[in-house]
Every structure is written in C-alpha cells, then in structure tokens.
A protein has these predicted regions:
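Active-site pre-lysine segment of PLP-dependent enzymes
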Residues: 1-21, 32
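Active-site C-terminal subdomain of aminotransferase-like
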Residues: 4-5, 34-53
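PLP-dependent enzyme catalytic core of the Aspartate aminotransferase-like
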Residues: 5, 122-127, 136-170
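Generic structural signal for small/hydrophobic residues in well-ordered secondary structure
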Residues: 9, 27, 58, 76-77, ...
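Short, conserved active-site loop motifs that form the nucleotide-linked donor/cofactor pocket
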Residues: 9, 93, 126
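Short beta-strand-to-turn element immediately C-terminal to the catalytic PLP-Schiff-base lysine
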Residues: 27-33, 63
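Conserved glycine-rich beta-strand-loop-beta hairpin in the small C-terminal domain of fold type I
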Residues: 59, 74-84, 94-107, 144
Length: 170
C-alpha cells in the first residue's frame, strides 16, 4: 500500500458509457475533498455542461437500471475472458493487455504495426490500430503492437476474428 495514497487517488466514472448515453458527457469524480474543490474551479472556468436530457438519462439509469447494468457488465466481462482464452491458442501473437473493449497485442511479423494493420484490413477485414497512434514518435519503439477492439462484436464474431488472425500472413 502506498503511503499517502489519498493525495494522488482520483477515480473517474462515466455514466455516458455505462448507460449508453452516446454524445452526453455525464460522469463522476471521486477524490479527496481538497482536490475536488480545485476540480470544481476548473469546471467553472470551461464551457462544459451536460445538457438536461443527459442528466435525466443518467439519473434514470442510477434509479432504474442497476439490473440491466449488471447484465451488461457480465456480457463485457465474458467477451474479455473469451478474447484472453482465444489469444492463448493463437501462436506467436502475444496479448499484452486486455480491457473491457480493447486488446493490446504484439504481432509476430517483422513489419511495423502500420503495415500489419493495413494488411489485416485488406486481407482479413479486421480493423485494428497501430501502436504509432498511441505512442510518441520515437525511433526506439519496436512498432510491433496493435490495438484490436472487440466491444462491438458478439461471441461468434470474436471466434471468427480469431480464425482470420490464425490464418493471417503478410
């Protein structure tokens, strides 16, 4: 346990993502009171105010949708588990990190990630993003990592994606 963790802890929560309030920026911040006062000063100085419809949607979600939210969370976690298991069976590809929506992967090819992502799209219809989008421009970067989104596909589509990855060659 880190000493004085309360001096650095900030937790952000997005009602917009949880309750699918697309386009509405509704969220919550948890931190110590003194920091929250400073955050409030910042928010007062920028032009950001969630519209009333988004606020009503978030409040409705909090009051009425906990069962639905629990089921959605389980679906997301099951997809994540499936992706992790599928990568265990995919030779030479290394899963570096897996969240609720994306997998961060090291590919087995000698080409850089920008070329690999282009070939994945043109040959296998898999849209992915090269690591160069997420990292600073630095010649020392390996450039062998890609990010694959899986939140918008179902279980059978995840299986199909891994069949395509298994048979993929540059």
């Amino acid at each position: 346990q880190k000493n004085n963790w309360e001096n650095t802890f900030i937790s952000l929560y997005s009602f917009s993502k949880s309750y699918r309030l697309t386009g509405h920026r509704i969220g919550a911040v948890i931190t110590k009171k003194e920091r929250l006062c400073q955050i409030e000063k910042f928010l007062d100085s920028v032009t950001i105010c969630p519209n009333q419809l988004g606020q009503i949607g978030a409040l409705f979600g909090l009051r009425k949708s906990s069962k639905w939210l629990k089921n959605e969370r389980l679906k997301i976690l099951n997809k994540k588990i499936q992706v992790i298991k599928e990568f265990e069976n995919l030779s030479n590809w290394k899963l570096k990190g897996c969240g609720a929506y994306f997998a961060y992967v090291e590919h087995p090819f000698s080409e850089c990630s920008s070329i690999v992502t282009q070939k994945l799209l043109s040959k296998k219809a898999i849209l992915s993003l090269p690591e160069t989008i997420f990292t600073p421009t630095n010649k020392k970067i390996i450039k062998k990592h890609i990010r694959i989104a899986f939140a918008n596909i179902n279980s059978s589509q995840i299986k199909e994606m891994f069949k395509r990855l298994k048979n993929f060659q540059i």
